[in-house]
């Protein structure tokens, strides 16, 4: 939790000429007594392509700071024209209002600044050498970008957690032994599983073949027994046996006629069971 909280910033002289001072009314709240002062700074970004043109316009130490809500006026000089490339004077740039405690920055407020001439003619056809006296600035005070940082204040308890955290055990194992170890274990486990599956398929196939062979042998033996029992030696039959069979056939035909008469007198009974059809 921050001991100092920024409540608001008002840009007082806006819009203004490029060479005029910057003025800010800053309001902040202090939650506990601080041992050191707050350092406020205003930085002008001279170029979007390189930070070598950045200028610290002014800095201010504020303190001792009482607990509660505090307000003050921060003034800063205009940037030095000689340190800004001519091509970077006109157009949009940025100013940064920052505050630090004991050399540790905890708040940063960024504003876009539009620099242009005060007449439409000069804006339509700007001269090669900028006319600084005719340039005006407009700070987009309604759209600041605020960034907060966690810092250590007076007590050790207020210090933020270190990032990344210390991991001394991570240095005990060489990177070559650490990286790829899990992948190697997974590949070995997959290979073992595939090998076990292939062995299981092979063993089950052998059992099926053996069972089929035994079954075929049993069927063949049964067929042999049936052929032996049902075989008839036609040549071994005697003429007497044949005559007896012919007489028996005659009697059977007579009996058959009687059976046909009996069956005609009795109606045939159906043995079919009703079948329900599921729709």
UniProtKB/Swiss-Prot annotation:
<dbReference type="GO" id="GO:0006337">
    <property type="term" value="P:nucleosome disassembly"/>
</dbReference>
<keyword id="KW-0539">Nucleus</keyword>
<dbReference type="GO" id="GO:0006335">
    <property type="term" value="P:DNA replication-dependent chromatin assembly"/>
</dbReference>
<dbReference type="Pfam" id="PF04729">
    <property type="entry name" value="ASF1_hist_chap"/>
</dbReference>
<keyword id="KW-0804">Transcription</keyword>
<comment type="subunit">
    <text>Interacts with histone H3 and histone H4.</text>
</comment>
<feature type="compositionally biased region" description="Acidic residues">
    <location>
        <begin position="179"/>
        <end position="194"/>
    </location>
</feature>
<feature type="compositionally biased region" description="Polar residues">
    <location>
        <begin position="268"/>
        <end position="279"/>
    </location>
</feature>
<comment type="function">
    <text>Histone chaperone that facilitates histone deposition and histone exchange and removal during nucleosome assembly and disassembly.</text>
</comment>
<comment type="similarity">
    <text>Belongs to the ASF1 family.</text>
</comment>
<dbReference type="InterPro" id="IPR017282">
    <property type="entry name" value="Hist_deposition_Asf1"/>
</dbReference>
<dbReference type="GO" id="GO:0000785">
    <property type="term" value="C:chromatin"/>
</dbReference>
<protein>
    <recommendedName>
        <fullName>Histone chaperone ASF1</fullName>
    </recommendedName>
</protein>
<dbReference type="InterPro" id="IPR036747">
    <property type="entry name" value="ASF1-like_sf"/>
</dbReference>
<keyword id="KW-0156">Chromatin regulator</keyword>
<dbReference type="GO" id="GO:0005634">
    <property type="term" value="C:nucleus"/>
</dbReference>
<feature type="region of interest" description="Disordered">
    <location>
        <begin position="179"/>
        <end position="279"/>
    </location>
</feature>
<dbReference type="GO" id="GO:0042393">
    <property type="term" value="F:histone binding"/>
</dbReference>
<keyword id="KW-0805">Transcription regulation</keyword>
<feature type="compositionally biased region" description="Acidic residues">
    <location>
        <begin position="219"/>
        <end position="262"/>
    </location>
</feature>
<keyword id="KW-0143">Chaperone</keyword>
<dbReference type="GO" id="GO:0006334">
    <property type="term" value="P:nucleosome assembly"/>
</dbReference>
<dbReference type="InterPro" id="IPR006818">
    <property type="entry name" value="ASF1-like"/>
</dbReference>
């Amino acid at each position: 939790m921050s001991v100092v909280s920024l409540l608001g910033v008002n840009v007082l002289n806006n819009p203004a000429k490029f060479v005029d001072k910057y003025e800010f009314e800053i309001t902040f709240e202090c939650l506990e007594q601080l041992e050191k002062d707050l350092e406020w700074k205003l930085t002008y970004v001279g170029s979007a392509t390189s930070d070598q043109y950045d200028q610290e316009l002014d800095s201010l130490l504020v303190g001792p700071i009482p607990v509660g809500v505090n307000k003050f006026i921060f003034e800063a000089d205009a940037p030095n024209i000689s340190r800004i490339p001519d091509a970077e004077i006109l157009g949009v740039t940025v100013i940064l209002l920052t505050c630090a405690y004991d050399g540790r920055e905890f708040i940063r407020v960024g504003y876009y600044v539009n620099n242009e001439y005060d007449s439409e003619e000069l804006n339509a056809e700007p001269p090669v050498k900028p006319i600084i006296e005719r340039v005006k600035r407009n700070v987009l005070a309604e759209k600041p970008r605020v960034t907060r940082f966690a810092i250590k204040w007076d007590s050790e308890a207020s210090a933020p957690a270190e990032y990344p955290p210390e991991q001394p055990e991570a240095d005990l194992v060489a990177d070559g032994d650490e990286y790829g170890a899990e992948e190697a274990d997974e590949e070995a486990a997959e290979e073992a599983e595939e090998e076990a599956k292939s062995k299981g398929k092979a063993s089950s196939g052998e059992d099926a073949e053996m069972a089929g062979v035994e079954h075929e042998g049993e069927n063949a033996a049964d067929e042999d027994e049936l052929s032996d029992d049902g075989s008839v030696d036609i040549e071994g039959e005697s003429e007497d046996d044949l005559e007896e069979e012919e007489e028996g056939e005659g009697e059977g035909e007579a009996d058959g006629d009687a059976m046909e008469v009996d069956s005609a007198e009795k109606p045939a009974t159906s043995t079919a069971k009703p079948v329900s059809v599921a729709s």
